[in-house]
Amino acid sequence: MTDIESALAHRLENHQIPHMEFPTTRASVHTLENGLTVLLDPDPQAPVISTQAWVETGSIHEGRFLGAGISHLLEHMVFKGTERYDGQAISDTVQAAGGEWNAYTTFDRTVYYIDGPAESVETFLSVLTEMVFKPSFPAEEFEKEKNVIRREIDMGMDDPDDRNGRLLYSTAYSIDARSQPVIGHMDLFNQLTREDMQKYHRERYTTENTF
């Protein structure tokens, strides 16, 4: 062992690793009569809230649509309107209540969230409930949103990191649904219809599948 290595070993041996402090949680789990699971984790010191809806629906659940990216397409279309709000009204309602919103789709889940002042919790929950369980899927927005995603797919194919990621997952999970990209393959994506999406929503976006 060299002098440098000896000195480094000595320093590491005597280095005190600080104890990590984790905040205590008051989280509780409740199941409603309709099967919806509700998780509450209050923090009275923070006057803000994060309202979220986690749907157990991602690319690995797509079954006959595997590789088409229907979960991701559905995530986009949910923002386009509900039985109660049109797309602009959703945005205006959230912003007027001081909220910021977004969503994402992964292999095993789709998550929608609105963050903002705690006093707006009822508004946020109302909007989230409408979006997740009562989307209207306006026909005039369907092809528009498909074109948005087509551009996303093209951009991904032009990105070396994205292509490497696809290659990694397709190799590591060659016999698993994770081998398929969440956003989908262009040829399969192009075949998706509005009716496909509506049926997929009815099958997957249930209260028992959401928390």
Task: Give the label of every model feature segment.
Residues 1-13, 25-26, 31, 39-42, ...:
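Charge-rich, well-structured scaffold segments of protease-associated domains
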Residues 19-22:
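Short loop/turn motifs at secondary-structure junctions and domain boundaries
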